């Protein structure tokens, strides 16, 4: 195994990863855009089966804080629109990113309320409650750290239900507090619920390009319980009526997309039922229904839940609910991506530029791996030194494969050479590379993060393809500087075109990842020279053995 063969192994792993990405994308195809119509009727299999009715028409009120711009419907108190002023829709745009939306083309809402036997949101008790509010617009004023938006409803029996949204400065977590005043003579059985519903089909104005084979990220539902910290639930699965039905204390339900999430976190000591539902008309839902509580006559009951609506900021999400930070989609290598991101964030706190932070973390990672790299090159050099003996043995033994294998292993043992020594560092490097890929694709901090010159967004592909070309050039130089024993004509042709093939693949990769690979290649060139000099002194390398 030599450097040329290592590149073949990397290529095989890389292509395998691309095939896996494409396969994942094919399993979750983006359906054709269709117009979504809102309906107030309740279909079989809908969320109403969980005691959660469909929305009706009411008055729309607005709530503005320093980080949120919400529209709430007084019919039921659902959040029908959410704008995030701190995050532009596109790079350089003054238009804020829209997370929740209620239009004829697309539905994405955060619903909540009180169901159960006596809850005003129970379909058996009539239309959803039409809340009264003091005014149509609420604004978090300068110097104000908390904003409360109370909404009240009194039913035919005289019972009063108050739903209060509590906003805090700089916070994407919104507490929803309920007060139930029982003025009757019988106990009221009340259960809180929280539901997220969304159109499966993405209209053009919602498409972020995350379905690109190189930029593919998860869009769908998720939930968490003490037993299952983080489980994804695909929209297609819900649409096929393969629905979730789990009971657990604690936990949360969420809907995810690249960089942003909404989540309902029940705040109670009882058991919650987590469910999904196909609502029809191309709309799916995930939600929770809490264990009912009794509010005795003459008493006032209090219940609460929390809505997260905003960017996937890991430390803030972790403070809101256990494992909510896992919604940052780092894939199956999250256990590598998370510490890498913490290190990257720590570096950024000093240098203030995410691009330079990526460069520094590349040097750190490659520095830590230098002993493995040195062992890899040493093993490959010893293997090259054994090639004449191996060739002579093959000629001597002819077609006797069994004896060839036995004598070859004896030769490796006598010369203290591990034939897999050149592969081991690759096995470690590839997961790190993939973990960096997931980290760059999932970390909101890198969205629209500039580097220098023409790179204004490290999470997007290079608009002029300069970085991928530079990556291909560095790969070409590594090839030219590496000794080789590849004699097969087909392998030689593959090696010749390898930099070109990788350059084409990397045209669609995030600029931050390509930057990492360029710097990593430059470090490889430097480390190669240092290692080869040491090997020359030991008689294990000769510069005459380079490629011409």
Swiss-Prot record:
The keyword Cell inner membrane applies. Its main location: membrane. Residues 28-54 are annotated as: Disordered. Keywords: Cell inner membrane, Cell membrane, Chaperone, Membrane, Protein transport, Transmembrane, Transmembrane helix, Transport. GO terms for cellular component: plasma membrane. One of its GO terms (biological process) is protein insertion into membrane. It is a multi-pass membrane protein. InterPro entries: Membr_insert_YidC (IPR019998), Membr_insert_YidC_N (IPR028053), YidC/ALB3/OXA1/COX18 (IPR001708), YidC/Oxa/ALB_C (IPR028055), YidC_ALB_C (IPR047196), YidC_periplasmic_sf (IPR038221). The chain crosses the membrane at residues 6-26, 350-370, 424-444, 458-478, 499-519. It is found in: Cell inner membrane. One of its GO terms (molecular function) is membrane insertase activity. Residues 29-42 have a biased composition (Low complexity). Belongs to the OXA1/ALB3/YidC family. Type 1 subfamily. Required for the insertion and/or proper folding and/or complex formation of integral membrane proteins into the membrane. Involved in integration of membrane proteins that insert both dependently and independently of the Sec translocase complex, as well as at least some lipoproteins. Aids folding of multispanning membrane proteins. Interacts with the Sec translocase complex via SecD. Specifically interacts with transmembrane segments of nascent integral membrane proteins during membrane integration. This is Membrane protein insertase YidC. It comes from Salmonella arizonae (strain ATCC BAA-731 / CDC346-86 / RSK2980).
